[in-house]
């Protein structure tokens, strides 16, 4: 009875999720607007999807991915982040490095530095850039920019220049 099992599993996930969100909201001592709670949850869900698809690496994992043999591989990732060749998003108390920005050789894709420059020039945060990269867009006929990072980096940068400069 796979359908019944699926429904039982879904019910369990819903209850667990509601309990966890309730506990988190209870920990906040001020009133939280529902729109804020929804936005935080949407961001959390997006990063979970990015993690499931590409990985969300800790600084140590990113450093190892880049080939560090140091006893502190996180330093290599931190240095690359400071040099603006990697993007990172805050996940709790640490920075997470989305796995999509690494090439097959483990090194940061050169396009990432160019995209960080575009984002910075348009006052976009790294989180905003990551979110834009992972969202479908009409600029790519419904594809996500992230799906073109390795195959058409110049086009991704050109589209970013146009899309990130839009003022609302």
What are these regions (language model features)?
Residues 1-168:
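Non-transmembrane "mature" sequence context
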């Amino acid at each position: 009875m796979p359908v019944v099992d699926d429904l039982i599993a879904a019910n369990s996930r819903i209850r667990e999720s509601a309990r966890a969100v309730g506990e988190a909201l209870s920990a906040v001592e001020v009133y939280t607007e529902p729109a804020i709670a929804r936005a935080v949850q949407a961001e959390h869900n997006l990063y979970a999807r990015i993690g499931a698809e590409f990985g969300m690496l800790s600084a140590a994992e990113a450093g190892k991915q880049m080939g560090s043999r140091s006893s502190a591989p996180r330093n290599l990732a931190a240095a690359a982040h400071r040099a603006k060749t990697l993007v990172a998003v805050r996940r709790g108390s640490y920075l997470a490095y989305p796995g999509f920005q690494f090439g097959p050789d483990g090194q940061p894709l050169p396009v990432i530095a160019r995209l960080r420059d575009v984002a910075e020039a348009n006052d976009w945060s790294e989180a905003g850039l990551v979110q834009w990269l992972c969202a479908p867009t009409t600029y790519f006929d419904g594809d996500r920019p992230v799906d073109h990072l390795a195959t058409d980096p110049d086009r991704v940068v050109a589209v970013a220049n146009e899309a990130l400069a839009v003022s609302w």
